[in-house]
Amino acid sequence: MGTNKPVVIGIAGGSGSGKTSVTKAIFDHFKGHSILILEQDYYYKDQSHLPMEERLKTNYDHPLAFDNDLLIDHLQQLLAYEQVEKPIYDYTLHTRSEKIIPVEPKDVIILEGILILEDPRLCELMDIKVFVDTDADLRILRRMQRDIEERGRTMDSVIDQYVNVVRPMHNQFIEPSKKFADIIIPEGGQNHVAIDIMVTKIATILEQKVNL
């Protein structure tokens, strides 16, 4: 375990942009090192106090849907090399699960989420801020596949949500947050050149911290 503060890489972008692919590529490159992934998706607000009809109205693409206070608290604890208990979100019940995931601190933290660059408090904790930029048509196709296969949604509900929620929220909150990125990666996880540049930059930062 390092004696210095861990390196935090923030990876943002629209739903279906390829954030997970970029995150996995970086994680796989450094998997022999001390590295972890912290997903903003796990930090949706607990809604157990609300009836199901109210939970179903949740706008998961709005900044207020996230419990960023808890996410920031956990990130600060990990930066202090303290263990945290990451929440699990149940998308079928539309609320936080009673289960948790213990997360041990690591020297490299990849923070991934659609709106992590929208919150200045999170940006302040990042060493590298990345925005994965992908064509809207490709993003909706990826989101449809994920929500149908992994979250039990119907195609009609996914399309309706995209038109009425996802697209306007992307234009209002996610796209504007791109200006806070240090690096913008077009073509998502297929852009191997950009990923290689990121890997080199991360390795340089890690080496500098070791030599401090």
Swiss-Prot record:
Localization annotation: Cytoplasm
Residues where ATP binds: 13-20
Signal peptide range in chain numbering: none
Pathway assigned in UniProt: Pyrimidine metabolism; CTP biosynthesis via salvage pathway; CTP from cytidine: step 1/3; Pyrimidine metabolism; UMP biosynthesis via salvage pathway; UMP from uridine: step 1/1
Alphabetized PANTHER family for the sequence: URIDINE KINASE
Taxonomic lineage of the native organism: Bacteria, Bacillati, Bacillota, Bacilli, Bacillales
Annotated GO CC locations: cytoplasm
Keywords: ATP-binding, Cytoplasm, Kinase, Nucleotide-binding, Transferase
TM spans (from-to): none
GO biological process: CTP salvage; UMP salvage
InterPro entries to which the protein is assigned, alphabetical: P-loop_NTPase (IPR027417), PRK/URK (IPR006083), Uridine_kinase (IPR026008), Uridine_kinase-like (IPR000764)
Listed name of the protein: Uridine kinase
